[in-house]
């Protein structure tokens, strides 16, 4: 499977935020019974007190995660819902990190449009 850049993270507390993100993504792996579905960019960029790095996922990992969450909640149709889950978890951890899609358009938008109407 190929790796795609999915989320872009801006963080002021690199160690705390990376720990929180690893926790939430490990939970995702447990939910769908898949290992090594995500990884972080090998080098973070540092500028003016902020750390910037990318989260890469395997296409199959994110597809299974969306399908799993869609079965639990039919409103989940693409990885936008996964982004909201991650953002909410970071808020609960009182993190100031900002996470967004690495590009303008979600990866699976076209794939799930016809499947999950």
Regions found by a protein language model. Give the residues of each.
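Short, intrinsically disordered low-complexity segments
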Residues: 33-76
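Short intrinsically disordered terminal tails
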Residues: 1-2, 115-117
